[in-house]
Every structure is written in C-alpha cells, then in structure tokens.
Amino acid sequence: METLLGGLLAFGMAFAVVDACPKYCVCQNLSESLGTLCPSKGLLFVPPDIDRRTVELRLGGNFIIHISRQDFANMTGLVDLTLSRNTISHIQPFSFLDLESLRSLHLDSNRLPSLGEDTLRGLVNLQHLIVNNNQLGGIADEAFEDFLLTLEDLDLSYNNLHGLPWDSVRRMVNLHQLSLDHNLLDHIAEGTFADLQKLARLDLTSNRLQKLPPDPIFARSQASALTATPFAPPLSFSFGGNPLHCNCELLWLRRLERDDDLETCGSPGGLKGRYFWHVREEEFVCEPPLITQHTHKLLVLEGQAATLKCKAIGDPSPLIHWVAPDDRLVGNSSRTAVYDNGTLDIFITTSQDSGAFTCIAANAAGEATATVEVSIVQLPHLSNSTSRTAPPKSRLSDITGSSKTSRGGGGSGGGEPPKSPPERAVLVSEVTTTSALAKWSVSKSTPRVKMYQLQYNCSDDEVLIYRMIPASNKAFVVNNLVSGTGYDLCVLAMWDDTATTLTATNIVGCAQFFTKADYPQCQSMHSQILGGTMILVIGGIIVATLLVFIVILMVRYKVCNHEAPSKMAAAVSNVYSQTNGAQPPPPSSAPAGAPPQGPPKVVVRNELLDFTASLARASDSSSSSSLGSGEAAGLGRAPWRLPPSAPRPKPSLDRLMGAFASLDLKSQRKEELLDSRTPAGRGAGTSARGHHSDREPLLGPPAARARSLLPLPLEGKAKRSHSFDMGDFAAAAAGGVVPGGYSPPRRVSNIWTKRSLSVNGMLLPFEESDLVGARGTFGSSEWVMESTV
C-alpha cells in the first residue's frame, strides 16, 4: 500500500512539472536542476509562466524586444541565462535584481544601444558577461559595480564603443579574458591593466589606438616568457589593425620579444604602412614641442572674464599647462578652466591675477614655454576723504548712489559734509537723436588722474553703462543712445591712493540731457515721396523734350511744303510752249526799222556737264559749221562760240538738270535768229531779244534755279512738251539752206527725252554730230529736253 501511494505521489509531481512548462518550450528535470529550453521558437516576449525554480533558461534565437522586471522576478536559483540572437533594444532597470545566483549572462547579437547604471544591477555573482555584437555606444561608469570582484570573462567586441569605464576595468582583479576588439577605442588610460594579474587574454584588434600605455603586464606577452605561474599566466595579446603612431612612445613595445602579428604603423608619414616589428628602434623618434601662437598682452577690467590662448605643436602632441604669477599651477576650478587646446579661461578676474602667466607645452621629447602679460584695471573704490568704505565686492560706482549721497550728505550726522562738485564741471553739447558730446574739466588741485570713468544711464530702463577714458581726454562722444529719452551722465576721476594702495575715485560732475526725438516713419515716407517726385520730374522733362522736338519737325515740314509751290510757281511764270519752235511776242515790240540785233549770248557756267573730249571736239566743229551757214544767210555776225570753261566740280543731278535747261533756252534763241529773216519774224525777234542779257543766266540766280529743280506736287507742276524738229537736221545734212522761206518741221515720234535718257542711262538714237549741237549754235529744229519745272 505504501508503495502504491509513493508511485502516485511521484506521478503527480511529474505531471505538475510538465504542466508548468511554457508552450513551445522543453522543460528538463535533471536531478535537482530544472532546465527550460525555448531556443528559436519565434517568441516575441519572455513567457510569463516559466517555473521560478528554473536553473537554466535558454531563450536564444527568438524575437524578444523588451526585458521587464516581471520577466525574471523571484528566479533566485537561476544560474545560466541565455538571451542571445534576439532583437532586444531595451532592458528595464533592475530587471535582473533577483538573479543573485546568476553566473553567466549572454546578451550577444542583440540591439542594445547602451548599458545604464542599473541595467545589470543585482548580479552579485556574475562571472561571464557576453555582450558582443550589439550597438553599444556607451557604458555607464557604475554599470559593472555589482560584479567587479567576481567577473572572469568580459566580451564587449563588435560594438561602437569609443571608451570604457577604465576605473571599473582596473578593479576586475579576477578577470581572465577581456575582448575589446572591433570597436572605436582610441585611448587607454595608463595603469589600466596594472592589477590584472590573472589576465590571460587581451584582444584589442581593429580599434583606433595610436599608442599603448607602457604597462608591465605586456611583458608577459613575450614569446620567451618562462616565468609564468598559475597566478600569472602568459598573456595572449593582440593589437593588430590599429593605426599605431610609431614614435618614441612605442619604443618599449618594439623592444618586446614576440611573434610577428602583422601589426603595422599608421603614422608618421615616413613609416606609414610598414610592419611594426620591422621598423628599427632608432626610427622611433619624437619631436620637441613648439609654441606657434599665444596671447602676448591682455588688459582686463577687474571682475570681467579673461581668455588666454596658447597653441603648440610637436610629436607627440604636447600637453599644455598654465602657471599663475604666484607660481601656482592653474587647474580647473569654479573660477578657472583649462581646455585641451591650451586655452585658459578666467571667469572672474581679481587684482591678484595681474602679472605674467606662463604657458608650458611638454611632451616626451621636451617642453617649451611662453609668457602672457595680464594687466587688471582695478575697480574704483571710495577714497578716505569721503568718510565711507566701499563693500569688498561692490561694483563700479553707481550714479544713483554716488550722486545722491553727495547731494544729501549734509543733513546726516554732525560730521563735515562732503565737498560738492564744482558748478558746471560737466557739459553736454551737440545732442542728436542717438549721440551726445560730453566735456569736463578738473581743478589743478586734483591728484594725478590715472583714468576717467564715464557713467550714464537711461531714465527708462535704469541700466548703468560705463566707459573707461584715458586721462589725456577731456571729452567723449556717447553713441548708440535712444531718441527722445532723458539721460543722467556723470564723470569720475580715478587715481592711485597711496594710503590704501588701491585706486581711489572722486566725482568730477554730473549732467542731465534729453536726446532729440526721431520720427523714422515720417522721414522714411518723406524720402519715398521725394524719390518718386524726382522720378516723375525727370520723366516729364524727357517727355516734354521729345514733344518739342516732334513739334519742331512738323512745323518745319509744313513750312517747307507751303514755300516750295510758291517759289516754284514764280520760277515757271515765264515758261511758254515751244511745241512749234516759235516764241510768242512780248507785250511791247521793238520799233520798226530797227536793225536786227544778234542773238543773246548764253553763258553756260559750271552748271554744264563735263562731256568727254571727243564730244567736245564734235561740238566745236558743229558750232563752226552752223555759224558759217548763218553768215552765208546774211546775218553779218561773227561766229558765236562758248568761252572755254574753267575747271568744274564733280557734276551732280542738280547741275545736270541746269545744263539741260540752259541748252533748251539757247536752242530757242537760235530759232528766233532763223525766224528773224522774215519780216514778221524779225520784229518779234527784236522784241524778244530786248529782254535778255548775255551776262545773266537764263534760269535766274543759282538759289532760284536750285529751287526750280526741286520736285513739286502734282497739282503745281507746269508741264511743257518738246519734240524733235528734223527739218534743220536734214538741211544741214544736205549742205545747204532752203532759200526764201521756212520749211515746216517734221515731227519724229517715240523719241526719248533727255531727262529720260539721263535717268535711265540710255543713249539717244542719233549720231554724235547730232548731240554736240548742245555745245555750239543750234538750229530751229534741234531737240530740247522735256523738263518739269
């Protein structure tokens, strides 16, 4: 019966254990330990129904994102926790607080960005911490505080760490393995590994280290180390893949005897890319520091901030220190700050800071110094003559305090009242909207003034403004004032008080003034209106000028059009038709029986065309023959020839037309001579010849002749038609003259006028002898150009 009850009890306990196992997990009951295995089950969170007596919990290969405090609460017996290969990005603080028995924690291959101070709190017995292949960018200084003395294996490889809590690492005295490879470490504090006597493996591969601190622990990494003990095993040290700066600071590492691990030099330029262990020891050199830039002199008002700069170069980069004038090393404090670039900031200067500050740049190769002179302008303090002592930390003299005290001091106590400042010691003139000129004067009994202090404030905001003025100046222009505002201005004189060895001050005088009012909007509007008015005026002037010019052109055009017809009409008033070669008789004829006068001589001046030499000779021969026939007919006159023409200017259209017109009138006079043989024609010819002169051009003055050749409107044209009379040409060709009368001329049709020939460039269909008659005497049947006057 007892055996049956024992079997039932064991079965019930096994059933209870199996029933407590989470879904998709495997629970193992191995003697006294209980294991819960849930690897790669696709879990999104830690199962809440895990047996709290679990000793080994494996949750790797899932999709857990968040770890909370309830996930591992009351698991005091948990020894091994695996959370590898998840997507954990956040661990709530104190989530492992109850895991006091945990020996191994695997958080590798997750997405942890950092480890806070309380992330790993409570793991007092932790020996193995594996946090590689995460996204760690920083680790808090107190993150490893609870297991510093128990930790044996720390793996932080394949992260983004720029630094570590090196003070915590220094205290991990039981650490056996430290993996820091494939990070962004660029500096290791000196003495970090001094107490890690049990360290057997140190991996610093693929970081940004340029140098390593000369620690004795690295001596155990030599290949010939025979002094290894269980408490001091040989060190496996790897530091390949770092840009080592091969100078004198790594000479100690080069002297170690160890196997070549393909470490290379990253700098300086002459050794870049060379294998570290192949570089000779004499090539590991350094350069002493050189100060390239520093502040020389600095003048600061007491109580204000001061900045001293000092820059130096060297190999390795030198460290810069500052020494105060009292030979005190300046460090970081509430009043001063020293930066890595060599700058010293003094936030509040005192009189003790006056003197020479020394900048010291030092490295492994030596040091260099530079001096900076600092002059402190001390704050003004009340003189002994004022019977007052200024507070130790008082600021510059206040207008409201100093001036009011001096005015009302006579009624307080029985002491002697202070002397009032002289009348009108300070004058303010040339006041504008934003500036004013202050002038002052001091008495001869005043001690030697070291400097003047000008104080002024605005009546609106009561902000006091100070200006320090050299003792040689007795005037100062105050700028940047507010328009239309009242100001209180005081001038103080400062000198050295020999009794107190401090700077004493006394009021020279005060004044009040108001700045002029300014109207920026109105002034802006006025300038805009003025600018627009100027544009309109200039535009109006341009338009008016154009209109006047157009009106002048139109008036001139109209006057020319009205004057031209009248002048042209006057020029053609004596024009008559010569269709038949006869001239109408004038109103009064010559008396009968008067001897016939010779034809008037027509003087062809420079208006004639300059024909070719051949045409001129032909014209002369034709003229001689024509005059010879005239003498045979009983004219009784000598042959009439044109005088030789003077050199003429270049012909133009005006001269061409004038020449043709002169030839036309000359032909008419020749016909009158021929007609004068008859009794009727002789009287008419005598009357006609009495109106012309051989000295006057037939077409009038040149000006009138030029105007007569201008084109006229169609309604004002005087038309005159001419034709060829071939009778005389035929007679001349036969060599005689028909006696006893005048044969009617024969008309020739379809003949081009001379103007048409001159315009169209065509030649007349006649012989050259017919054309040269224009230069000699003309018969009654000679052709005349058709012209429009």
From Swiss-Prot:
InterPro entries listed in its UniProt record: Cys-rich_flank_reg_C, FN3_dom, FN3_sf, Ig-like_dom, Ig-like_dom_sf, Ig-like_fold, Ig_I-set, Ig_sub
UniProt modification remark: Glycosylated.
Description of its domains: The PDZ-binding motif is required for cell surface expression, neurite outgrowth promotion and interaction with DLG1, DLG3 and DLG4.
Bias type Pro residues, positions: 583-599, 641-650
Protein name: Leucine-rich repeat and fibronectin type-III domain-containing protein 2
Stored CDD domains: FN3
Single GO cellular component term: postsynaptic density membrane
Record region (Disordered): 383-424, 577-602, 619-654, 668-702
